[in-house]
């Protein structure tokens, strides 16, 4: 075996629940990475870089582990919308996104701390938002509090009601951990799935 344990570099309950679908034992660890986009960085590049940085940050503390990192950025016409952090910012993001098609770039990285091998894939999802009224946006933000969610919409919960449609290769990508891509990477590391 080329690793001693599997570690998810995230404290997200949604990512943890998704990874549990693989029925593999794993731990979680906070990555403590600055998620600020670099100047002139394209949205998929930001997501890829942060997914790898998160996995590497945790791999330093778990030198025999296989570490999974993930990151998601929402982009509207090339502009990145990260985690809003405040109610006002969440409302502002959703006001900008109403009626628009937003691309959610979700990257997943696997770092084998023992061998140094790094794998990363990016899975985009196109999301068409409804024409939302200000009242709908305020009600949603008040009920859901999507302050820690790229683009301010949690599709795995009440946020699904904000959408007209979505399209992508992996339905789990929009929730924050693309399991189809991840299963490919874990099999490449020797894990037996299923």
UniProtKB/Swiss-Prot annotation:
One of its GO terms (molecular function) is nucleoside triphosphate diphosphatase activity. Its EC number is 3.6.1.-. One of its GO terms (cellular component) is cytoplasm. Disulfide bonds: none annotated. The keyword Hydrolase applies. It is found in: Cytoplasm. Its cofactor is a divalent metal cation. The record marks 14, 72, 156 as: Important for substrate specificity. The keyword Hydrolase applies. Keywords: Cytoplasm, Hydrolase, Nucleotide metabolism. Nucleoside triphosphate pyrophosphatase that hydrolyzes 7-methyl-GTP (m(7)GTP). May have a dual role in cell division arrest and in preventing the incorporation of modified nucleotides into cellular nucleic acids. HAMAP family: Maf. PANTHER family: 7-METHYL-GTP PYROPHOSPHATASE, BIFUNCTIONAL DTTP/UTP PYROPHOSPHATASE/METHYLTRANSFERASE PROTEIN-RELATED. This is 7-methyl-GTP pyrophosphatase. It comes from Aromatoleum aromaticum (strain DSM 19018 / LMG 30748 / EbN1) (Azoarcus sp. (strain EbN1)). The lineage of its organism: Bacteria, Pseudomonadati, Pseudomonadota, Betaproteobacteria, Rhodocyclales.
């Amino acid at each position: 075996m080329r690793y001693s344990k599997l570690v998810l570099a995230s404290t997200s309950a949604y990512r943890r629940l998704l990874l549990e679908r693989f029925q593999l034992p794993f731990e979680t660890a906070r990555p403590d990475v600055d998620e600020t986009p670099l100047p002139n960085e394209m949205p998929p590049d930001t997501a890829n870089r942060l997914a790898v940085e998160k996995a590497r940050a945790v791999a330093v503390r778990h030198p025999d582990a296989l570490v999974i990192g993930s990151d998601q950025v929402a982009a509207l016409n090339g502009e990145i919308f990260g985690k809003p952090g405040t109610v006002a910012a969440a409302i502002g993001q959703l006001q900008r996104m109403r009626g628009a098609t937003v691309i959610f770039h979700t990257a997943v990285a696997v770092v084998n701390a023992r061998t140094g091998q790094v794998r990363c894939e990016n899975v985009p999802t196109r999301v068409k938002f409804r024409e939302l009224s200000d009242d709908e946006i305020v009600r949603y933000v008040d009920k859901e509090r999507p302050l820690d969610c790229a683009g301010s919409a949690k599709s795995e919960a009440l946020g699904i009601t904000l959408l007209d449609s979505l399209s992508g290769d992996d339905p789990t990508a929009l929730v924050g951990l693309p399991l189809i891509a991840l299963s490919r990477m874990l099999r490449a590391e020797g894990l037996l799935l299923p």
